[in-house]
Regions:
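Feature for exported/extracytoplasmic and membrane-associated proteins, marking the mature portion
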Residues: 1-395, 399-406, 446-516
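Proline-centered loop/turn at the N-terminus of a beta-strand
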Residues: 124-126, 414, 440
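Active-site lining segments that contact anionic ligands and/or coordinate catalytic metals
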Residues: 366-368, 410-412, 418, 436-439, ...
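Metal-dependent active-site segment of extracytoplasmic phospho-/sulfohydrolases and closely related
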Residues: 397, 403-429
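Histidine-centered active-site microenvironments of extracellular/periplasmic hydrolases
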Residues: 419-452
Length: 516
């Protein structure tokens, strides 16, 4: 398995195309922020068929038990209005949406997603329906008659394999280990980020992740750097003053000062280089006042307050979810994953430190930032866990968007979701849902053309789109089509997008159209 940069990344044709793209937008800035929902979020409860006019509403009510589905009236009417205030009609009714995407019938967002619903009405939220891993365009017949062939992704319902499939976006059974963020930075950095102070234009704020793995010689960058040399305390690293004492900055393959030399091309040398780049990322932020000066009485103070207030809201919020064993009762739950707001804050710090101010910062025109949060594998008591997870996600996205707006970058930063796979449309016997295939994804930002994308779903159990009788639906869009639309906005020319997404030309269209 080779991790060497392919020759077609460095041909004169490719280099000229990327150089011209960089020159055309000289001085501009764009950032893609991925939020990976580890465990597979149930998107059928994120975006819900609503109203008698939507033929999928009756299918939804039949397939999902009380305590799993949304929009029920219990005896006390406690939950009767939970969808009434969350409809996604456009200005002209269900036939339109704010950004022009098609909405043939009424739909609603989960009641935990009030802030994202505001983004919808601002035209800043795209809902891309039925996205998933596809080897090539697939029908139920092809899936059933070719069980060991190209129409069935490897270990389709396995978390780890499908997470890698989303993060790598490589052709069927490719031996490579790179991720699509990493390959993007291989393609763009020379001309969009030529003087940056870390090895790569993509950074993970959630630990080392395959999505950011690039071809050699690019090295993964993790922020904040959290790995400490053996025998040293956490306080050993003062990132703004001691990084040159930890390694020889100007000698990429040098060993840390005071440590034995490291032979080239071994695991420890690779680890040292990854750590050095992560330390550099920390230094780039710290050189910019730790991201910002929270005591400056201006923008820094306001940015700090955004995340402090969001954290306070998360830890002080409780939700009442239906008790599936008692139609009169509810379960009260505090919001989990309060740490995720700190992840959003770290993303904001990386974005804030994007530029070159008196020799500090990342000096990047194109940034790709990976983040992730777990807790979405809800086989049991879905609403007790899923509802507060969605509320946390809603608060976190709003905080990051508020910070980006304060920086004047509302149209420059696009946030999008990924997850392992969809969940079964039919609930199971423990008031949860199981592993499935396609699901719905969110894209949020000032450059997003808000609305619904993709045809009306076919939610008939055992129907033409269901490869089981449980509601495991074939994706309408491949992940390549989803990512390709984002890369087009990122100014990668059409002819070069297959370098990042080698299988994209198997699918039509290659641009779904949800970005300006």
């Amino acid at each position: 398995m080779s991790n060497q940069l392919p020759v077609n990344y460095t041909t004169q044709e490719t280099r000229t195309a990327i150089e011209n793209a960089a020159a055309a937008g000289a001085g501009d800035y764009k950032c893609l922020v991925c939020i990976f929902l580890f465990g597979a979020s149930d998107s059928h409860n994120m975006v819900v068929p609503y109203g008698n006019g939507n033929p999928n509403r009756s299918l939804y009510e039949t397939a999902r038990a009380y305590g799993v589905r949304l929009g029920d009236k219990n005896v006390t009417n406690q939950f009767s209005n939970e969808l009434d205030s969350m409809t996604l009609n456009g200005a002209g009714g269900p036939g339109t949406s704010p950004g022009g995407g098609a909405v043939a019938y009424e739909w609603a967002l989960h009641p935990s997603l009030t802030r994202l619903r505001s983004d919808w009405y601002d035209g800043d939220l795209a809902i891309v329906r039925d996205v998933g891993v596809l080897n090539r365009p697939t029908t139920k017949e092809l899936y059933n008659t070719n069980p060991n062939d190209l129409y069935r992704p490897d270990r389709l319902f396995a978390h780890n394999i499908q997470q890698l499939a989303w993060q790598k976006a490589l052709p069927f059974r490719s031996p490579e280990s790179t991720g699509w963020f990493g390959r993007t930075t291989n393609l763009l950095d020379e001309f969009f980020n030529p003087d940056m102070r870390v090895s790569s234009g993509c950074i993970s704020v959630s630990g080392a992740n395959p999505q950011t793995f690039a071809y050699s010689p690019k090295i993964n960058v993790v922020y904040p750097a959290t790995v400490i040399p053996e025998g040293k305390s956490r306080s050993y690293i003062n990132f703004t003053t001691t990084r040159d004492n930890f390694y020889h900055k100007n000698s990429p393959d040098a060993s840390p000062v005071g440590y034995p030399p490291l032979p080239k091309n071994n695991v420890m040398n690779a680890f040292s280089r990854i750590f050095r780049n992560s330390v550099d990322s920390q230094a780039a932020v710290n050189s910019n006042g730790g991201g910002w000066d929270e005591n400056d009485g201006g923008v820094g103070t306001q940015l700090e307050a955004i995340f402090d207030n969001a954290y306070t809201e998360i830890i002080n919020t409780t939700l009442d979810t239906p008790d599936p064993n008692d139609v009169n009762g509810s379960n009260s739950r505090t919001l989990p994953n309060s740490y995720f707001i700190n992840t959003m804050k770290n993303i904001a710090k990386v974005i804030y430190s994007r530029g070159d101010v008196s020799g500090v910062g990342f000096n990047q025109r194109r940034q790709l930032i990976f983040s992730g949060v777990g807790g979405w594998d809800n086989h049991n008591n879905l609403r007790y866990f899923h509802d507060p997870n969605l509320k946390t996600l809603d608060i976190c996205i709003k905080a990051l968007r508020d910070a980006v707006k304060l920086m004047g970058l509302e149209n420059n930063v696009t946030i999008f979701t990924e997850t392992d796979f969809g969940r079964t449309f039919r609930s199971n016997g423990t008031y949860g849902t199981d592993h499935a295939w396609s699901g719905h994804s969110f894209v949020v930002g000032g450059a997003v053309k808000g609305g619904m994308y993709g045809p009306e779903p076919d939610y008939i159990l055992g129907g033409d789109k269901d490869v089981s009788n449980l509601g495991r639906f074939i994706p309408n869009y491949s992940i390549e089509q989803y990512y390709g639309t984002l890369l087009k906005w990122f100014d990668i020319p059409d002819a070069q997008i297959p370098l990042v997404l080698p299988a994209i030309d198997l699918f039509t269209p290659t641009n779904i159209g949800f970005m300006e």
